[in-house]
Amino acid sequence: MKNTYAKNISSAWRLLLETGIDTFPVSTKRIAAHLKIPVLRYSRGEPILKELGLYDAAMYSDGITIPLGVGKVVVMYDDSIKTPRARVAIGHELGHIMLGHATVGVATADNHPPRPGDTPPEFAANLWCEQLIAPTGVLLAAGITTRETIEEVCQVNRRASDFILARLAERQGYTPSHPDEIEVVRRFMR
C-alpha cells in the first residue's frame, strides 16, 4: 500500500495545478468536472442505484464509485450528510478512481469517515483525498496545524480533521520534495 501511495499521491497535486485551485476549501466537484466524472446525489441517482442493485450498499456509505465501462465512471454521494463530510466523500471516491481501485462491474461502496482498521484500499483513498483537500505541505507552510483550523479552513468534518492531524504528526520536519507539491505550496501561499 505504501508503494501505491508514493507512486500515485502526486496525481492529487497535479489535479490541483491543472485546475488552478490555489485556495481552501478545495472543490472536489470542480476536480471531478475537470476529470469529466459525473457526481450525482443519491436523491437524484436513486433509480440508477436500484437498477444496478447498489441501493442498499449506498445507504450504508457516504459515497460510491460506479465503473460503467473502460474510462467511464460515476461518483454518487449521500446528500443527507453535511457539506464538509460530502467534500471528503467525493474526494475519497476520486482517490479510488485515481489509484486504480475502480474496476468495471465492481462498485466501491465502503466510504465512511476515516477510522482505525480501514482496509489498505480505503486507507490509500483517504491518504489521496487528504493530499487533495488538505495538502500537507500547504498546511505546514500556512501553520494550519490544529483540528479547529483544519476544519474551518479546509471545510472538512471532525473525523477527517483527526485523520489529517494524525498524518501531520507522522510527518514532523516534513519538507515537500516532489515538484508538483512544491508548486502547489507556492501557489497556495501567494
Predicted regions, residues:
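Active-site hotspot residues in diverse enzymes, especially metal/ion-binding acidic/histidine motifs
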Residues: 1-190
